[in-house]
Amino acid sequence: MAVGKNKRLSKGKKGLKKRTVDPFSRKDEYSVKAPSTFQIRDVGKTLVNRTTGLKNANDSLKGRIFEVSLADLQNDEDHAFRKVKLRVDEVQGKNCLTNFHGLDFTSDKLRSLVRKWQSLIEANVTVKTTDDYLLRLFAIAFTKRRPNQIKKTTYARSSQIRAIRKKMTEIIQREAASCTLSQLTTKLIPEVIGREIEKSTQGIYPLQNVHIRKVKLLKSPKFDLGALLNLHGESTTDDQGHKVEREFKETVLESV
């Protein structure tokens, strides 16, 4: 047998020198805070790479969007079918301050609403709030049986659907355009707009399961830190200088 270098033995030694670095050792944990319009403020935790050189951790966090169940934010299982989007606008210490970014229904809830023998009516409205947030609201409604109705189906005529849709857009426009984004959020949680639509369309055709199924944020105004801190119930730091009143004494030179 020829004596020579055994290639198989030398191959195994290369991997021993490599050290595996845990990627989580370079990351920091930040708390995500929801606005004060919701009952539960602590949304959860998020990870980000630590600030190194020109890469700032705060810049990586700003703009992150979190999708949270409204049931967790309100501590109420009745809101489990609605999802709220929260966007990180500011980082203070280890806290990420978020703002409302949108609302949506779970797909299983939407599928459960659509049934036979009834008409589905949808409407969408683009509206601007008083604090210059441009939103698009999508509403959904279904017809229901009139009292003492024997007929199985509850199909509405085209003229009735148009009248209901017109009423829906008017109510959404009125309710959303007359308030700020935070005030609109407080209206969306208990479904004030849906109940208002249901009540006002009784004369045209009785409705059921009337919801604002989706809210889409199209455009935000220029970022205002003071407004965000007020939304989170935190006092703003006063950066303006105070007027200092001091007696002015003119120095007189005795010798020139």
Curated annotation (Swiss-Prot):
Modified residues (N-acetylalanine): 2
Main location: cytoplasm
Annotated segments matching region Disordered: 1-20
Protein keywords: Acetylation, Cytoplasm, Ribonucleoprotein, Ribosomal protein
Any single biological process term in GO: translation
Family: Belongs to the eukaryotic ribosomal protein eS1 family.
Cited HAMAP family: Ribosomal_eS1_euk (MF_03122)
Subunit structure and binding partners: Component of the small ribosomal subunit. Mature ribosomes consist of a small (40S) and a large (60S) subunit. The 40S subunit contains about 33 different proteins and 1 molecule of RNA (18S). The 60S subunit contains about 49 different proteins and 3 molecules of RNA (25S, 5.8S and 5S).
Protein name: Small ribosomal subunit protein eS1
